[in-house]
């Protein structure tokens, strides 16, 4: 081999390696942030997001704080922005606490979306939403009403915190529906477990001890619902109806033992997957508008809705809500079909 030919081959090899390196660096990087790590609901959402990343050949990083806090999420957001991530998808612990960090991210060209729990709409582009407050609040009340078969009843609400966006919107709608459709129901207390399993169990036991004649606990939170079920078992209370939102894998033993007759949720794996697909469209095409539809492998078709479906007044180009296609009520007959 001549020296000239050797140099030519070496140069082409170097160029090829450089091209591969550039392609690797150019791959989209998307951060998918839960309220906190270590909770099955959020882990399942992260699994869906990372599955979508593999299907789309994009790099999806799942990471969150160990406790649900604004400061913890802000630190992660800032870190991902500084590392050059192209998009951030976050389940917000506060409707406004993340806004300064998210607005700075958008100013630097990062696509910002929310999933599960929204910020103020001006602080993100799209919210991947499990259901409108009216849909989910109504679902909670209807599940309770199927078990509380009397005009006068005592009901407790129990969920994560007084500031979290999504759950407070659902509870507001649920309480309004109770006032309208079940005026004899008395809401005796509203309490919080703050996304902590131990505190949630203690709080649930406290509710059942303080209100021994309670008819229903409505717990729209992945920690609060199993805590309420466990508290009822610990206290041997089989009279109270326990409904709410959590994952089927967590709730399966309580359903099989009859402690919980039915509960609801949505396919959070699909929610994570949809979130990444929408982010990928934004990174490739720039924006979506109200009415645009997107076909997603293994999910079906989703559509961009205006912010008004969530009760917001704010509307802007490149801003809206993508609703999940359906929600699910789990019971003893169908829970075996689900694994997340």
UniProtKB/Swiss-Prot annotation:
InterPro entries: Bact_Solute-Bind_Prot2, LsrB, Peripla_BP_I, SBP_2_dom. It holds the Pfam family Peripla_BP_4. CDD domains: PBP1_LsrB_Quorum_Sensing (cd20003). Keywords: Periplasm, Signal. Transmembrane segments: none annotated. One of its GO terms (cellular component) is outer membrane-bounded periplasmic space. GO terms for molecular function: carbohydrate binding. The complex is composed of two ATP-binding proteins (LsrA), two transmembrane proteins (LsrC and LsrD) and a solute-binding protein (LsrB). This is Autoinducer 2-binding protein LsrB. The lineage of its organism: Bacteria, Pseudomonadati, Pseudomonadota, Gammaproteobacteria, Enterobacterales. The gene is lsrB.
């Amino acid at each position: 081999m001549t020296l000239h030919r050797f140099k030519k081959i070496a140069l082409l090899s170097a160029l090829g390696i450089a091209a591969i390196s550039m392609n690797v660096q150019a791959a989209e990087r998307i951060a998918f942030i839960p309220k906190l790590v270590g909770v099955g609901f959020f882990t399942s959402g992260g699994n869906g997001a990372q599955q979508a990343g593999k299907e789309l050949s994009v790099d999806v990083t799942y990471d969150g704080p160990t406790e649900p806090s604004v400061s913890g999420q802000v630190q992660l957001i800032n870190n991902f922005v500084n590392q050059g991530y192209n998009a951030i998808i976050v389940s917000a612990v506060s409707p406004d606490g993340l806004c300064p960090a998210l607005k700075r991210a958008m100013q630097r060209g990062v696509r910002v979306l929310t999933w599960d729990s929204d910020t103020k709409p001006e602080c993100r582009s799209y919210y991947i939403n499990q259901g409108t407050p009216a849909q989910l609040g109504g679902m909670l009340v209807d599940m309770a009403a199927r078990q509380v078969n009397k005009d006068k009843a005592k009901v407790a609400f129990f969920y994560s915190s007084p500031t979290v966006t999504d759950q407070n919107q659902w509870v507001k709608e649920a309480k309004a529906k109770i006032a309208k459709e079940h005026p004899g129901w008395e809401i005796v207390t509203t309490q919080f477990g703050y996304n902590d399993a131990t505190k949630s169990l203690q709080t649930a036991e406290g509710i059942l001890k303080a209100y021994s004649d309670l008819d229903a606990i409505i717990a729209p939170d992945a920690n609060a619902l199993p805590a309420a079920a466990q508290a009822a078992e610990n206290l041997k209370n089989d009279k109270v109806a326990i409904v709410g939102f959590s994952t089927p894998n967590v709730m399966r033993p309580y359903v099989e033992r009859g402690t919980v007759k039915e509960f609801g949720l949505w396919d959070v794996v699909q929610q994570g997957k949809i979130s990444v697909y929408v982010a990928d469209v934004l990174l490739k095409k720039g924006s979506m508008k109200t009415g645009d539809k997107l076909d997603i492998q293994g999910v079906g078709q989703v559509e961009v809705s205006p912010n008004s479906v969530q009760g917001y007044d704010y509307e802007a180009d490149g801003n809206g809500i993508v609703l999940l296609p359906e929600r699910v009520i789990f019971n003893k007959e169908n829970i075996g079909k689900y694994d997340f």
